[in-house]
Curated annotation (Swiss-Prot):
EC number: 7.4.2.11
The gene coding this protein: metN3
Top-level taxon in the UniProt lineage: Bacteria
Organism: Bacillus cereus (strain ZK / E33L)
Name of the protein this chain belongs to: Methionine import ATP-binding protein MetN 3
Coiled coil, from the record: none
Main location: membrane
Length: 341
């Protein structure tokens, strides 16, 4: 569906060339939700703007739906852009137009007749849950409602691809989840390919099938979201995963608990997919002559399955503890010793 081959974007500056995207290679399948995550300055905004040619690549090739979009210009590019919708962090609505008129705007530009425009706008207002707000102006809407207008407008011309440029960064957590649920619903209903960029791992976890991690213009890691959660390879990826699995407060709590358990071992168990539902601790206590205390635990649901972790204290004879650890490995649960007496 979408293919990036050795794509590079270099900006000219007085202080010298700035490489925003450095030899990016990506393949995004039709109908998937693909996330790109990175901190500020990683190059992700430059990358997503290459998809619809708001930015031209310095080198490399971009293919969308078997069309080399990086090689076309003029009317052909304008037509291709109608098949690529985009929503933005700050909505980019026309403040002098109503909700209906904002959604209708790209249809006007495309030359769609008035009756068809009206019908399409009605469909989109229903799709994004804005019934009864069609005559309101952007200033009368909440942040979440404004983004719903942005989504409806982006879908006006029935695009094959929807680009999301930090679409939830300006929203509160509850509204963020509502918008993410809407994007999930649209993806399932329309079979729409969604590419989103974000600096929040929560967004990736909640709706993405696969993720690419960017750092200093380079794509340093890609893979299914659950695989990245389970086994992050790069330091930056590990930091993003820790946003959800290890908060600063959690780490401080674990450190204080470790001080209370000077004997035995404190271990972290990681559960992936079906392993989340296994009675691992019950089996451990049944077959081992040790004491088991749960210090901390959490579970997260990704679009590919569940991911969870437990921090537990194992206390008893050293031989019994080692046998318990071997038993945990046999249950195909990943284990890390984080402290031992």
């Amino acid at each position: 569906m979408i293919l990036l081959e050795n794509v590079k974007k270099i900006y000219k500056a007085k202080s010298g060339d700035v490489t925003a995207v450095d030899n990016a290679n990506l393949k995004i399948d039709k109908g998937e939700i693909f996330g790109v995550i990175g901190y500020s300055g990683a190059g992700k905004s430059s990358l997503i703007r290459l998809f619809n040619q708001l930015e031209k690549p310095t080198s490399g090739q971009i293919t969308i739906a078997n069309r080399v979009i990086s090689a076309i210009t003029g009317s052909e590019l304008r037509k291709a852009r109608q098949e690529i919708g985009m929503i933005f962090q700050h909505f980019n609505l026309l403040w002098s137009r109503t909700v209906r008129e904002n959604i209708e705007f790209p249809l006007e530009i495309a030359g769609v007749d008035k009756a068809k425009r009206r019908k399409r706008v009605d469909e989109l207002i229903h799709l994004v849950g804005l019934e009864g707000r069609g005559d309101a102006y952007p200033s009368q809407l909440s942040g979440g409602q404004k983004q719903r207008v942005g989504i409806a407008r982006a879908l006006a011309n029935n695009p094959q691809v929807l680009l999301c440029d930090e679409a939830t960064s300006a929203l509160d957590p509850e509204t963020t989840d509502q918008i993410l649920d809407l994007l999930l619903d649209i993806n399932k209903r329309l079979g729409l390919t969604i590419v989103l960029i974000t600096h929040e791992m929560h967004v990736i976890r909640k709706i993405c099938n696969r993720v690419a991690v960017m750092e200093k213009g380079k794509i340093v890691e890609t893979g299914p979201v659950l695989d990245v959660f389970r086994n992050p390879q790069q330091d930056i990826t590990k930091r993003f995963v820790q946003q959800l699995t290890d908060s600063e407060d959690t780490n401080e709590t674990i450190e204080s608990l470790i001080e209370k358990y000077p004997d035995g071992k404190v271990v972290r168990l990681q559960f992936i997919g079906e392993a989340v539902e296994r009675p691992v601790l019950q089996r451990l206590m049944q077959r081992s002559d040790i004491e088991v205390s749960i210090l901390q635990g959490n579970i997260a649901q990704t679009n590919n399955g569940s991911y969870g972790s437990l921090v537990v204290h194992l206390n008893g004879e050293e031989t019994a503890i080692q046998q318990a650890i071997e038993g945990i490995h046999q249950d195909q649960v990943e284990l890390e010793v984080i402290a031992h007496g």
